[in-house]
Curated annotation (Swiss-Prot):
Signal sequence region: none
Gene3D superfamilies reported in the protein's UniProt record: Acyl-CoA dehydrogenase/oxidase, N-terminal domain, Butyryl-CoA Dehydrogenase, subunit A, domain 2, Butyryl-CoA Dehydrogenase, subunit A, domain 3
SUPFAM superfamilies per the UniProt record, alphabetical: Acyl-CoA dehydrogenase C-terminal domain-like, Acyl-CoA dehydrogenase NM domain-like
Protein name stated in the entry: Acyl-[acyl-carrier-protein] dehydrogenase MbtN
Amino acid sequence: MTLAAHTTEDYEELLGRVFDDQVKAWTAEAEASERFPRQLIEHLGRTGVFTQKWGDGQQPDVAKLIALALELGRLGSAGIGVGVSLHDSAIALLRRFAKNDYLRTICEQAIRGEAVLCIGASEISGGSDLQIVGTEVRSVRDGYEVRGVKKFVSLSPIADHIMVVARNVDHDPGSRHGNVVVIAVPTSQVEAQAPYRKVGAGPLDTAAVHIDTWVPGDALIARPGTGLAAISWGLAHERLSIAGQVAGASQRVIGITLARMMKRRQFGHTLYEHQALRMRMADLQARVDMLRYALAGIAAGGRLDLRAAAAIKVTAARLGEEVLSECMHIFGGSGYLTDETPLGRWWRDMKLARVGGGTDEVLWELVAAAMRPDYDGYDELIDSPTGDD
């Protein structure tokens, strides 16, 4: 057994101990109140979940990232899973790009669960275009003035620091392109608005944040021109986590639906004995298995790749939506009753996977940008019609 495999197994055992009945109770309470339990982040930090995942390096242990994501997915709460992964993705930003003690202290506090982090990227107009940033940063008094409004800032009502994507206007105030920075802003210096009412993921406290403050120079995480690269790194971490959460959630739902099929009888037979339903479930299981194997392959590679994270997130999200829809269908009328089964809530939750962390189309563009045509193969096998050359 390799050392890497041994340490990953140790981490999985740690997760098995940490995600106990107390975590399940916090999750159930959060679903009822639609508020994220800060004590969960504190618990994960105190028990070493983030410390063991990150170690001393700037790069995440990808196998442990995926192991944590699978465990979060099995909780059956997208709001809880995504909230934890967003906090951890902000840690990823700081671990790689923090260059001073001020930022390193924030990072280590977050790893210990003593501080909660969130990311402010989307502008008030919404959307995924981070190249056009309205929030402005100006150099003032050995620090920076930060002004703007961020629309979708999950965890902002309970967080201590926001990793804000902004635009430096020191040299080109009129331009809305380029000069993107990432800067840490304490939530004590901003105005978090009332959390939105959402279709699903109730516990994921998400609100607009109004920013008009000054922060010290050491709060700058990524200097002008490097902000997009930095936030892309954090997003890749989030996307890979979402894929793992979808895999964990999908497997749990399939297992519960299969139990339903074994127990429920219609027309003199169990649902499982009806071939059409059984084949439908087998198809879903096969594809969820393939997703899990793909995640294992990424874990074995040991590298957080931006394109691979985009590809597996969009593929997982679309599969997860299908899994939930089909399983809810197999539950029949009971699946549509929120007081009888959680299928309807899980179905609504899964939609977030196709929107949060980048929509399908944004992620497909990242995949498309890395595709390479095989001109040699084409020329060898295909006769070009006259006029093509």
